[in-house]
């Protein structure tokens, strides 16, 4: 009960600050759930989506969502889209299978880093990056290497606060079909919770961890949340719609 009350108080205090937020990658699974949860919790006075195309929503709750359409190959021409946001969430990402090796690096490293640079220049104070369990710039695996590289590069920008989330396998029902992922999700879903939670995490838990974290005051400039910490924070009492 005390934890629930404390979290509710943190949220209320955060709302009173009338902060603005942008989301990169709102068309993806994590970004889509993040947007939904942000609107349900009402944490921000202004919500902006930055993406390569305008998204369509039928629900009334989305009517005040702002959208900035940009060309990620010419992001400098769209610097204004990144101006005036207090908080940023970056959920950009693709796969080597979908985009090829060069395309994957371009999206997951180059687009993310350039977006972070423009966000910093535009006044963003708290940048949140969705990365991956095992991210390591020295890894022999391209995926983990790129994730580790971009983590380090964004840290060099010296945001007032920089939060990196390293979830395991994301458990969700993708709108986009990715061969093999369905089997992986079924595999983890059949395992004991104690084992599966160390290597996987539901998308909604990641999103709630992000939002529970953003309302908590922190002295550290950089914070790294691994899969277990994401589970713990995402399942904190009061993490549902207020």
Curated annotation (Swiss-Prot):
Superkingdom of origin: Eukaryota
Positions bearing N-acetylalanine: 2
Subcellular location: Cytoplasm
UniProt keywords, alphabetically: Acetylation, Cytoplasm, Disulfide bond, Host-virus interaction, NADP, Translation regulation, Tumor suppressor
Tissue-by-tissue expression: High levels in liver, lung, skeletal muscle, pancreas and placenta. Moderate levels in heart and kidney. Low levels in brain. Not expressed or low levels in variant small cell lung carcinomas, 33% of hepatocellular carcinomas and neuroblastomas. Levels are reduced in the heart of patients with hypertrophic cardiomyopathy and failing hearts.
Residues engaged in binding NADPH: 27-30, 52-53, 92-93, 143, 147, 170, 178
Variant or mutagenesis effect after changing residue 108 to Y: In a hepatocellular carcinoma sample
UniProt region (Required for interaction with elongation factor EEF1A1), positions on chain: 2-25
UniProt-annotated catalytic positions: 143 (proton acceptor), 147
Primary location recorded for the protein, binned into one broad class: cytoplasm
Stored InterPro entries: NAD(P)-bd_dom, NAD(P)-bd_dom_sf
Classification via Pfam families: NAD_binding_10
GO cellular component terms, A-Z: cytoplasm; cytosol; mitochondrion; nuclear envelope
Keyword Cytoplasm annotated: yes
Transmembrane parts of this sequence: none
The keyword Acetylation is annotated on this UniProt entry: yes
Single biological process term from Gene Ontology: apoptotic process
Record-level Gene Ontology MF annotations: oxidoreductase activity; protein serine/threonine kinase activity
Assembly: Monomer. Forms homodimers during oxidative stress. Interacts (via N-terminus) with elongation factor EEF1A1 (via middle-region); the interaction is direct and competes with EEF1A1 binding to guanyl-nucleotide exchange factor EEF1B2, thereby inhibiting GDP for GTP exchange and reactivation of EEF1A1. Interacts with nuclear transport receptors XPO4, IPO5/RANBP5, IPO7, IPO9 and KPNB1 as well as GCN1L1/GCN1 and LRPPRC probably through their HEAT repeats. Binds NCOA5/CIA. (Microbial infection) Interacts with HIV-1 Tat (via activation domain).
Stated role: Represses translation by preventing reactivation of elongation factor eEF1A. May also inhibit nuclear import by competing with nuclear import substrates for binding to a subset of nuclear transport receptors. Has additionally been proposed to act as a redox sensor involved in cellular oxidative stress surveillance.
Domain comment, as recorded: Unique C-terminus confers high proteasome-dependent instability to isoform 2.
PANTHER family tied to this protein: OXIDOREDUCTASE HTATIP2
Name of the protein in its database record: Protein HTATIP2
Native organism: Homo sapiens (Human)
Gene name of this polypeptide: HTATIP2
């Amino acid at each position: 009960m005390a934890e629930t009350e404390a979290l509710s108080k943190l949220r209320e205090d955060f709302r009173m600050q009338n902060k603005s937020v942008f989301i990169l990658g709102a068309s993806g699974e994590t970004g889509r759930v993040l947007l939904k949860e942000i609107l349900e919790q009402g944490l921000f006075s202004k919500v902006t989506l930055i993406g390569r195309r305008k998204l369509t929503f039928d629900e009334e709750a989305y009517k005040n969502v702002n959208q900035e359409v940009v060309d990620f190959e010419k992001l400098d021409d769209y610097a204004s889209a990144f101006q005036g946001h207090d908080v940023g969430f970056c959920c950009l990402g693709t796969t080597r299978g979908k985009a090829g090796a060069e395309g994957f690096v371009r999206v997951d490293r180059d687009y993310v880093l350039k977006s972070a640079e423009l966000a910093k220049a535009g006044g963003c104070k708290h940048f949140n990056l969705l990365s991956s369990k095992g991210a390591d710039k020295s890894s022999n695996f391209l995926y983990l290497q790129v994730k580790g590289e971009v983590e380090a590069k964004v840290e060099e920008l010296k945001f007032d606060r920089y939060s990196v989330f390293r979830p395991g396998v994301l458990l969700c029902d993708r709108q986009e079909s990715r061969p093999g992922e369905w089997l992986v999700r079924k595999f983890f879903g059949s395992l004991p919770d104690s084992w599966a939670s160390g290597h996987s995490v539901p998308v909604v838990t990641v999103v709630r961890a992000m939002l529970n974290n953003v309302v908590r005051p922190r002295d550290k400039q950089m914070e790294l949340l691994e899969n277990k910490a994401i589970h713990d924070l995402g399942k904190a009492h009061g993490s549902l719609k207020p």
